[in-house]
A protein has these predicted regions:
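Aromatic-lined carbohydrate-binding/catalytic grooves of carbohydrate-active enzymes
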Residues: 99-133, 226-234, 405
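Substrate-binding cleft of secreted/luminal carbohydrate-active enzymes
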Residues: 33, 300-314, 325-330, 335-408
Protein backbone atom coordinates (compact mmCIF):
# COMPACT_ATOMS: atom_id res chain seq x y z
CA UNK A 1 0.00 0.00 0.00
CA UNK A 2 3.04 2.30 0.15
CA UNK A 3 2.53 3.14 -3.49
CA UNK A 4 -0.09 5.61 -2.23
CA UNK A 5 2.56 7.44 -0.26
CA UNK A 6 4.63 8.29 -3.32
CA UNK A 7 1.89 8.75 -5.82
CA UNK A 8 2.31 12.54 -6.39
CA UNK A 9 5.82 11.84 -7.71
CA UNK A 10 4.46 9.07 -9.88
CA UNK A 11 1.86 11.51 -11.17
CA UNK A 12 4.56 13.84 -12.44
CA UNK A 13 6.31 10.99 -14.23
CA UNK A 14 3.03 9.81 -15.65
CA UNK A 15 2.25 13.22 -17.10
CA UNK A 16 5.63 13.21 -18.82
CA UNK A 17 4.81 9.82 -20.28
CA UNK A 18 1.42 11.09 -21.44
CA UNK A 19 3.14 13.82 -23.39
CA UNK A 20 5.17 11.29 -25.35
CA UNK A 21 2.67 8.46 -25.86
CA UNK A 22 -0.65 10.26 -26.15
CA UNK A 23 -2.70 8.59 -28.90
CA UNK A 24 -3.25 10.33 -32.20
CA UNK A 25 -5.02 13.65 -32.10
CA UNK A 26 -7.21 15.11 -34.79
CA UNK A 27 -8.18 18.57 -35.88
CA UNK A 28 -11.78 19.28 -35.04
CA UNK A 29 -14.16 19.47 -37.96
CA UNK A 30 -15.41 22.86 -38.99
CA UNK A 31 -18.13 23.91 -36.59
CA UNK A 32 -21.53 23.15 -38.00
CA UNK A 33 -24.81 24.61 -36.86
CA UNK A 34 -26.14 22.10 -34.31
CA UNK A 35 -29.34 20.31 -35.16
CA UNK A 36 -31.69 19.57 -32.29
CA UNK A 37 -32.60 15.92 -32.01
CA UNK A 38 -35.48 14.17 -30.34
CA UNK A 39 -33.85 13.14 -27.07
CA UNK A 40 -33.11 15.39 -24.13
CA UNK A 41 -29.45 14.34 -24.15
CA UNK A 42 -29.00 15.36 -27.77
CA UNK A 43 -30.67 18.69 -27.07
CA UNK A 44 -28.30 19.20 -24.15
CA UNK A 45 -25.29 18.42 -26.35
CA UNK A 46 -26.55 20.81 -29.04
CA UNK A 47 -26.69 23.61 -26.50
CA UNK A 48 -23.14 22.84 -25.45
CA UNK A 49 -22.01 22.97 -29.06
CA UNK A 50 -23.09 26.60 -29.24
CA UNK A 51 -20.75 27.56 -26.41
CA UNK A 52 -17.34 28.94 -27.24
CA UNK A 53 -14.75 26.17 -27.28
CA UNK A 54 -11.22 26.98 -26.08
CA UNK A 55 -8.78 27.03 -29.00
CA UNK A 56 -6.68 24.18 -27.61
CA UNK A 57 -9.73 21.97 -27.28
CA UNK A 58 -11.07 22.97 -30.67
CA UNK A 59 -7.84 21.85 -32.34
CA UNK A 60 -6.87 18.76 -30.38
CA UNK A 61 -8.77 16.01 -28.64
CA UNK A 62 -8.31 12.37 -27.75
CA UNK A 63 -9.26 9.89 -30.46
CA UNK A 64 -10.25 6.39 -29.35
CA UNK A 65 -9.77 3.38 -31.60
CA UNK A 66 -13.25 2.21 -30.56
CA UNK A 67 -16.43 3.65 -32.00
CA UNK A 68 -19.61 4.00 -29.95
CA UNK A 69 -22.67 6.00 -30.88
CA UNK A 70 -24.91 7.54 -28.25
CA UNK A 71 -28.20 5.61 -28.35
CA UNK A 72 -31.62 7.16 -28.89
CA UNK A 73 -31.83 7.20 -25.08
CA UNK A 74 -29.66 5.33 -22.60
CA UNK A 75 -31.45 2.36 -21.05
CA UNK A 76 -28.79 0.58 -19.06
CA UNK A 77 -27.81 -1.89 -16.37
CA UNK A 78 -25.18 -1.87 -13.63
CA UNK A 79 -22.36 -4.39 -14.09
CA UNK A 80 -19.66 -5.23 -11.53
CA UNK A 81 -16.05 -5.74 -12.53
CA UNK A 82 -16.41 -9.42 -11.69
CA UNK A 83 -19.42 -9.74 -13.99
CA UNK A 84 -17.73 -7.83 -16.80
CA UNK A 85 -14.66 -10.03 -16.57
CA UNK A 86 -16.41 -13.34 -15.97
CA UNK A 87 -18.90 -15.76 -17.45
CA UNK A 88 -21.85 -13.57 -16.46
CA UNK A 89 -20.82 -11.02 -19.06
CA UNK A 90 -22.27 -13.16 -21.85
CA UNK A 91 -25.57 -13.49 -19.99
CA UNK A 92 -25.80 -9.73 -19.55
CA UNK A 93 -24.95 -8.93 -23.16
CA UNK A 94 -27.65 -11.39 -24.26
CA UNK A 95 -30.13 -9.58 -22.01
CA UNK A 96 -29.33 -6.35 -23.81
CA UNK A 97 -29.37 -8.00 -27.25
CA UNK A 98 -32.85 -9.39 -26.64
CA UNK A 99 -34.47 -6.27 -25.17
CA UNK A 100 -34.66 -2.52 -25.65
CA UNK A 101 -31.75 -2.08 -23.25
CA UNK A 102 -28.61 -0.65 -24.84
CA UNK A 103 -26.02 0.33 -22.22
CA UNK A 104 -23.78 -0.94 -19.43
CA UNK A 105 -22.43 0.93 -16.42
CA UNK A 106 -19.29 -1.02 -15.48
CA UNK A 107 -17.31 -0.67 -12.26
CA UNK A 108 -13.82 0.68 -12.86
CA UNK A 109 -13.26 1.78 -9.25
CA UNK A 110 -15.63 0.06 -6.88
CA UNK A 111 -17.07 0.90 -3.48
CA UNK A 112 -14.12 -0.14 -1.30
CA UNK A 113 -11.54 1.59 -3.50
CA UNK A 114 -10.34 -1.32 -5.62
CA UNK A 115 -9.72 -0.71 -9.31
CA UNK A 116 -11.20 -3.59 -11.30
CA UNK A 117 -8.35 -4.22 -13.74
CA UNK A 118 -4.56 -4.36 -13.65
CA UNK A 119 -2.90 -1.43 -15.45
CA UNK A 120 -0.20 -2.23 -17.96
CA UNK A 121 2.28 0.10 -16.29
CA UNK A 122 2.96 1.27 -12.76
CA UNK A 123 0.37 3.84 -11.73
CA UNK A 124 -0.61 5.48 -8.43
CA UNK A 125 -3.45 3.01 -7.92
CA UNK A 126 -1.51 -0.12 -8.87
CA UNK A 127 -1.54 -1.30 -5.26
CA UNK A 128 -5.34 -1.53 -5.22
CA UNK A 129 -5.79 -2.95 -8.72
CA UNK A 130 -7.60 -6.28 -8.99
CA UNK A 131 -7.65 -8.58 -11.98
CA UNK A 132 -11.45 -8.76 -12.22
CA UNK A 133 -11.26 -7.76 -15.87
CA UNK A 134 -8.14 -9.36 -17.31
CA UNK A 135 -8.49 -7.33 -20.49
CA UNK A 136 -10.86 -4.35 -20.23
CA UNK A 137 -10.08 -3.45 -23.84
CA UNK A 138 -11.44 -6.82 -24.89
CA UNK A 139 -14.59 -6.16 -22.87
CA UNK A 140 -15.05 -2.83 -24.62
CA UNK A 141 -14.41 -4.37 -28.03
CA UNK A 142 -17.19 -6.87 -27.33
CA UNK A 143 -19.51 -4.00 -26.43
CA UNK A 144 -18.53 -2.14 -29.58
CA UNK A 145 -19.33 -5.20 -31.71
CA UNK A 146 -22.79 -5.38 -30.13
CA UNK A 147 -23.47 -1.65 -30.18
CA UNK A 148 -23.69 -1.43 -26.38
CA UNK A 149 -22.90 2.01 -24.96
CA UNK A 150 -20.20 1.82 -22.21
CA UNK A 151 -20.16 3.92 -19.03
CA UNK A 152 -17.34 3.69 -16.48
CA UNK A 153 -18.47 3.91 -12.85
CA UNK A 154 -15.93 5.41 -10.46
CA UNK A 155 -16.68 5.55 -6.74
CA UNK A 156 -14.96 8.68 -5.47
CA UNK A 157 -15.03 9.58 -1.79
CA UNK A 158 -16.07 6.24 -0.29
CA UNK A 159 -12.67 4.60 -0.40
CA UNK A 160 -11.63 2.40 2.51
CA UNK A 161 -8.38 1.38 0.85
CA UNK A 162 -7.11 4.91 0.35
CA UNK A 163 -8.40 6.07 3.73
CA UNK A 164 -6.47 3.34 5.54
CA UNK A 165 -3.31 3.90 3.50
CA UNK A 166 -3.48 7.68 3.83
CA UNK A 167 -5.26 8.71 7.05
CA UNK A 168 -4.20 12.29 6.33
CA UNK A 169 -6.67 12.25 3.42
CA UNK A 170 -9.47 10.86 5.55
CA UNK A 171 -11.44 11.54 8.75
CA UNK A 172 -9.93 10.28 12.00
CA UNK A 173 -11.12 9.69 15.55
CA UNK A 174 -9.54 11.39 18.57
CA UNK A 175 -7.20 8.41 18.95
CA UNK A 176 -5.94 8.81 15.39
CA UNK A 177 -7.80 5.80 14.01
CA UNK A 178 -9.54 6.22 10.66
CA UNK A 179 -13.27 6.66 11.16
CA UNK A 180 -15.61 4.09 9.63
CA UNK A 181 -19.38 3.85 9.49
CA UNK A 182 -21.53 1.02 10.82
CA UNK A 183 -20.68 -1.11 7.81
CA UNK A 184 -16.94 -0.71 8.31
CA UNK A 185 -16.63 1.66 5.34
CA UNK A 186 -14.33 4.66 5.40
CA UNK A 187 -14.31 7.83 3.33
CA UNK A 188 -11.66 10.19 2.07
CA UNK A 189 -12.21 13.91 2.26
CA UNK A 190 -13.71 15.99 -0.56
CA UNK A 191 -11.67 18.88 0.83
CA UNK A 192 -8.42 17.24 -0.31
CA UNK A 193 -7.45 18.01 -3.88
CA UNK A 194 -4.99 15.14 -3.89
CA UNK A 195 -8.06 12.88 -3.69
CA UNK A 196 -9.62 14.71 -6.64
CA UNK A 197 -6.52 14.18 -8.75
CA UNK A 198 -6.25 10.52 -7.81
CA UNK A 199 -9.80 9.75 -8.93
CA UNK A 200 -9.70 11.86 -12.07
CA UNK A 201 -6.52 10.11 -13.20
CA UNK A 202 -8.39 6.80 -12.92
CA UNK A 203 -11.19 8.37 -14.95
CA UNK A 204 -8.74 9.50 -17.63
CA UNK A 205 -7.40 5.99 -17.98
CA UNK A 206 -10.96 4.68 -18.36
CA UNK A 207 -11.51 7.21 -21.13
CA UNK A 208 -8.30 6.09 -22.82
CA UNK A 209 -9.53 2.50 -22.71
CA UNK A 210 -12.55 3.59 -24.73
CA UNK A 211 -15.37 4.31 -22.29
CA UNK A 212 -17.64 7.04 -23.64
CA UNK A 213 -18.86 8.31 -20.30
CA UNK A 214 -17.45 8.63 -16.81
CA UNK A 215 -19.98 8.24 -14.02
CA UNK A 216 -18.85 9.41 -10.59
CA UNK A 217 -20.59 7.87 -7.58
CA UNK A 218 -20.35 8.68 -3.87
CA UNK A 219 -19.58 12.28 -4.71
CA UNK A 220 -20.27 13.32 -1.15
CA UNK A 221 -19.34 13.26 2.49
CA UNK A 222 -20.48 10.34 4.66
CA UNK A 223 -24.16 10.29 5.55
CA UNK A 224 -24.93 12.12 8.78
CA UNK A 225 -21.63 13.98 8.68
CA UNK A 226 -23.23 17.06 10.23
CA UNK A 227 -23.70 15.03 13.44
CA UNK A 228 -20.03 14.08 13.76
CA UNK A 229 -18.37 17.10 12.16
CA UNK A 230 -17.14 18.42 15.52
CA UNK A 231 -15.95 15.01 16.69
CA UNK A 232 -13.76 14.00 13.76
CA UNK A 233 -10.36 15.36 12.84
CA UNK A 234 -9.65 16.27 9.23
CA UNK A 235 -7.81 18.80 7.11
CA UNK A 236 -9.89 21.47 5.38
CA UNK A 237 -7.07 22.17 2.96
CA UNK A 238 -7.70 25.25 0.84
CA UNK A 239 -11.20 25.52 2.30
CA UNK A 240 -9.95 26.39 5.79
CA UNK A 241 -9.93 30.11 5.01
CA UNK A 242 -13.12 30.17 2.94
CA UNK A 243 -15.63 32.51 4.59
CA UNK A 244 -18.52 30.02 4.73
CA UNK A 245 -20.10 27.90 7.42
CA UNK A 246 -19.28 24.20 7.44
CA UNK A 247 -22.40 23.17 5.51
CA UNK A 248 -21.61 25.61 2.72
CA UNK A 249 -17.96 24.55 2.71
CA UNK A 250 -19.00 20.94 2.17
CA UNK A 251 -21.30 21.91 -0.67
CA UNK A 252 -18.58 24.02 -2.26
CA UNK A 253 -15.98 21.24 -2.02
CA UNK A 254 -18.26 18.64 -3.61
CA UNK A 255 -19.38 21.02 -6.36
CA UNK A 256 -15.80 22.14 -7.01
CA UNK A 257 -14.71 18.53 -7.46
CA UNK A 258 -17.39 17.92 -10.08
CA UNK A 259 -16.42 21.10 -11.92
CA UNK A 260 -12.74 20.12 -11.79
CA UNK A 261 -13.43 16.61 -13.08
CA UNK A 262 -15.56 17.90 -15.94
CA UNK A 263 -12.85 20.30 -17.06
CA UNK A 264 -10.05 17.73 -16.74
CA UNK A 265 -11.96 15.25 -18.90
CA UNK A 266 -12.87 17.64 -21.72
CA UNK A 267 -9.90 16.52 -23.81
CA UNK A 268 -11.16 12.94 -23.83
CA UNK A 269 -14.53 13.63 -25.48
CA UNK A 270 -16.45 11.80 -22.79
CA UNK A 271 -19.68 12.70 -21.07
CA UNK A 272 -19.52 13.21 -17.33
CA UNK A 273 -22.31 12.04 -15.06
CA UNK A 274 -22.85 12.01 -11.31
CA UNK A 275 -24.98 9.75 -9.13
CA UNK A 276 -26.89 11.70 -6.50
CA UNK A 277 -29.38 10.98 -3.75
CA UNK A 278 -32.92 11.50 -5.01
CA UNK A 279 -33.90 13.50 -1.95
CA UNK A 280 -31.23 16.07 -2.86
CA UNK A 281 -33.62 17.36 -5.52
CA UNK A 282 -36.31 18.02 -2.91
CA UNK A 283 -34.28 20.40 -0.73
CA UNK A 284 -31.91 23.31 -1.39
CA UNK A 285 -28.89 21.35 -0.24
CA UNK A 286 -28.10 18.41 1.98
CA UNK A 287 -26.55 19.63 5.25
CA UNK A 288 -24.28 16.67 5.92
CA UNK A 289 -23.19 15.13 2.65
CA UNK A 290 -22.57 18.34 0.71
CA UNK A 291 -24.77 17.66 -2.32
CA UNK A 292 -26.60 20.55 -3.96
CA UNK A 293 -28.67 19.10 -6.79
CA UNK A 294 -28.76 22.26 -8.91
CA UNK A 295 -25.07 23.10 -8.52
CA UNK A 296 -23.96 19.58 -9.38
CA UNK A 297 -26.38 19.48 -12.32
CA UNK A 298 -24.85 22.69 -13.65
CA UNK A 299 -21.51 20.91 -14.03
CA UNK A 300 -22.41 17.59 -15.66
CA UNK A 301 -23.80 16.19 -18.88
CA UNK A 302 -25.99 13.64 -17.10
CA UNK A 303 -27.50 13.57 -13.62
CA UNK A 304 -28.46 10.17 -12.23
CA UNK A 305 -30.70 10.39 -9.18
CA UNK A 306 -30.97 7.22 -7.14
CA UNK A 307 -34.73 7.00 -6.70
CA UNK A 308 -35.23 3.43 -5.55
CA UNK A 309 -38.69 3.28 -3.92
CA UNK A 310 -37.26 1.18 -1.07
CA UNK A 311 -34.97 4.03 -0.03
CA UNK A 312 -37.69 6.59 0.67
CA UNK A 313 -39.65 7.38 3.80
CA UNK A 314 -43.29 8.52 3.38
CA UNK A 315 -41.92 11.80 1.98
CA UNK A 316 -44.47 12.14 -0.83
CA UNK A 317 -47.36 11.03 1.36
CA UNK A 318 -46.89 7.41 0.29
CA UNK A 319 -46.97 5.21 3.40
CA UNK A 320 -44.97 2.33 1.92
CA UNK A 321 -43.03 3.62 -1.09
CA UNK A 322 -41.41 0.25 -1.77
CA UNK A 323 -44.82 -1.19 -2.60
CA UNK A 324 -45.86 1.79 -4.76
CA UNK A 325 -43.10 2.12 -7.38
CA UNK A 326 -45.22 4.00 -9.93
CA UNK A 327 -46.50 6.57 -7.43
CA UNK A 328 -43.08 7.17 -5.92
CA UNK A 329 -41.28 7.66 -9.22
CA UNK A 330 -44.11 9.77 -10.62
CA UNK A 331 -44.02 12.14 -7.65
CA UNK A 332 -40.25 12.37 -7.69
CA UNK A 333 -40.09 13.05 -11.43
CA UNK A 334 -42.40 16.06 -11.05
CA UNK A 335 -40.09 17.57 -8.45
CA UNK A 336 -36.90 16.90 -10.41
CA UNK A 337 -38.35 18.34 -13.61
CA UNK A 338 -39.08 21.64 -11.86
CA UNK A 339 -35.56 21.85 -10.49
CA UNK A 340 -33.92 21.09 -13.83
CA UNK A 341 -36.23 23.43 -15.75
CA UNK A 342 -34.90 26.30 -13.64
CA UNK A 343 -31.37 25.75 -14.97
CA UNK A 344 -30.08 27.54 -18.07
CA UNK A 345 -28.60 24.36 -19.52
CA UNK A 346 -29.97 21.35 -17.66
CA UNK A 347 -28.23 18.00 -17.98
CA UNK A 348 -29.90 14.85 -19.21
CA UNK A 349 -31.87 13.13 -16.47
CA UNK A 350 -31.07 9.44 -16.21
CA UNK A 351 -32.29 8.06 -12.87
CA UNK A 352 -31.30 4.82 -11.22
CA UNK A 353 -34.37 2.65 -10.65
CA UNK A 354 -34.96 -0.46 -8.56
CA UNK A 355 -34.70 -4.06 -9.71
CA UNK A 356 -34.12 -5.72 -6.32
CA UNK A 357 -35.95 -6.58 -3.11
CA UNK A 358 -35.56 -4.74 0.20
CA UNK A 359 -35.91 -7.37 2.96
CA UNK A 360 -34.62 -4.95 5.61
CA UNK A 361 -37.96 -3.12 5.40
CA UNK A 362 -40.06 -6.10 6.43
CA UNK A 363 -40.39 -8.29 9.50
CA UNK A 364 -42.38 -10.84 7.52
CA UNK A 365 -42.42 -11.64 3.82
CA UNK A 366 -40.61 -9.20 1.54
CA UNK A 367 -42.41 -7.32 -1.21
CA UNK A 368 -41.16 -8.76 -4.48
CA UNK A 369 -39.92 -6.78 -7.46
CA UNK A 370 -40.77 -8.31 -10.79
CA UNK A 371 -41.93 -7.31 -14.25
CA UNK A 372 -44.81 -5.10 -13.08
CA UNK A 373 -42.73 -3.16 -10.57
CA UNK A 374 -39.86 -2.47 -12.96
CA UNK A 375 -42.18 -1.49 -15.80
CA UNK A 376 -44.15 0.78 -13.45
CA UNK A 377 -41.04 2.85 -12.71
CA UNK A 378 -40.16 3.17 -16.39
CA UNK A 379 -43.75 4.17 -17.21
CA UNK A 380 -43.69 6.89 -14.56
CA UNK A 381 -40.44 8.29 -15.92
CA UNK A 382 -41.63 8.23 -19.53
CA UNK A 383 -44.91 9.93 -18.65
CA UNK A 384 -42.90 12.77 -17.13
CA UNK A 385 -40.69 13.18 -20.19
CA UNK A 386 -37.70 11.27 -18.80
CA UNK A 387 -36.52 8.85 -21.48
CA UNK A 388 -33.36 7.47 -19.89
CA UNK A 389 -32.85 5.16 -16.93
CA UNK A 390 -30.44 2.72 -15.31
CA UNK A 391 -31.36 -0.50 -13.52
CA UNK A 392 -29.64 -1.31 -10.23
CA UNK A 393 -29.16 -4.79 -8.92
CA UNK A 394 -26.03 -5.24 -6.81
CA UNK A 395 -25.42 -8.81 -8.03
CA UNK A 396 -26.48 -8.07 -11.62
CA UNK A 397 -29.45 -10.45 -11.57
CA UNK A 398 -32.11 -8.62 -13.55
CA UNK A 399 -35.79 -9.45 -13.90
CA UNK A 400 -36.61 -11.46 -16.99
CA UNK A 401 -39.45 -10.56 -19.32
CA UNK A 402 -39.49 -6.80 -18.72
CA UNK A 403 -40.65 -4.66 -21.63
CA UNK A 404 -38.24 -1.72 -21.77
CA UNK A 405 -39.82 -0.20 -24.88
CA UNK A 406 -40.23 3.57 -24.40
CA UNK A 407 -43.71 5.05 -24.44
CA UNK A 408 -44.64 6.82 -27.67
Amino acid sequence: MQKYIRWPVTMILMLVVFASITPAVSAADEEEEPTLKATSHQKHQSKLAKHEVPEALARFSFVSDLNFEYPDAVRGIYVTGNSAGGSRFETLTKLIDNTELNSMVIDIKEDNGYVTYKPEEELPYEGVAKNYMKDPKEVLKALEDKGIYPVARIVVFKDTMLAEARPDLSFTESDGEVWSNGKGESFVSPFKKEVWEYNVEIAKRAAELGFKEIQFDYVRFPEGFEKRDDELQYDLGEYADVDLDNVKKRVKAVTDFVSYAKKELEYYNVDVSVDIFGYAATIEETPGIGQNFSKISDNVDVISSMIYPSHWTPYFGIDKPDTEPYKLVNEYAKVENKVLEALDNPPTSRPWIQDFEAPWLYSGSTFQYGVDEVEAQIKALNENGIDEFLLWNAVNSYTEGVDYTPLD
